[in-house]
């Protein structure tokens, strides 16, 4: 007989060019990203802090295990995408009868629910970058 699948919530998160699929299960607070623990995957403490923010805000770090697969972008974008995914998974858990539907407003006030729309501006023809032009020479 097949074992019943463990209840989990899925949250998709995006930031810059990164995209993350986050699976939230009840557990002990373990965070696994692309098969590696959080501390091994992100070298910078800032990125680790960003990933933990929604769990810390709701004070539920030790109640859930987080499994995430993330691709594209750099460290900052990936951390932001995972944070967005965790937030969406927490809201899904909450609205399915977890805590009575109060987490969404708390997370929205903290600014975690909204997808950050800022993207890298494209490089223009005739310029060195998006806006940087050639150096001006008076003579």
Curated annotation (Swiss-Prot):
Establish whether keyword Ribonucleoprotein is in the entry: yes
Q: Name one Pfam family in it.
A: Ribosomal_S9
Give one GO biological process term. translation
User: Any coiled-coil ranges, and where?
Assistant: none
Query: By its UniProt entry, which PROSITE patterns does this protein fall under?
Result: RIBOSOMAL_S9
Keyword list (alphabetical) reads: Ribonucleoprotein, Ribosomal protein
Q: Does the keyword Transport feature in the UniProt annotation?
A: no
Highest taxon in the source lineage: Bacteria
Q: Name one GO cellular component term.
A: cytosolic small ribosomal subunit
Report a single Gene Ontology molecular function: RNA binding
Query: What SUPFAM superfamilies does the record point to?
Result: Ribosomal protein S5 domain 2-like
The UniProt similarity line reads: Belongs to the universal ribosomal protein uS9 family.
HAMAP family per record? Ribosomal_uS9_B
What is the official name of this protein in its record? Answer: Small ribosomal subunit protein uS9
Q: Which organism encodes this protein?
A: Coxiella burnetii (strain CbuK_Q154)
């Amino acid at each position: 007989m097949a074992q019943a699948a463990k209840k989990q919530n899925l949250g998709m998160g995006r930031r810059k060019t990164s995209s993350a699929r986050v699976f939230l299960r009840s557990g002990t607070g373990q965070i696994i990203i692309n098969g590696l623990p959080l501390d091994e995957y992100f070298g910078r403490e800032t990125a680790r802090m960003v990933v933990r923010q929604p769990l810390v805000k709701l004070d539920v770090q030790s109640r859930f295990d987080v499994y995430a697969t993330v691709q594209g972008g750099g460290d900052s974008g990936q951390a932001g995408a995972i944070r967005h995914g965790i937030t969406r998974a927490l809201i899904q858990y909450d609205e399915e009868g977890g805590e009575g539907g109060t987490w969404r407003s708390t997370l929205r006030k903290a600014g975690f629910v909204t997808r950050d729309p800022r993207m890298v501006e494209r490089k223009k023809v005739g310029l060195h970058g998006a806006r940087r032009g050639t150096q001006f020479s008076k003579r």
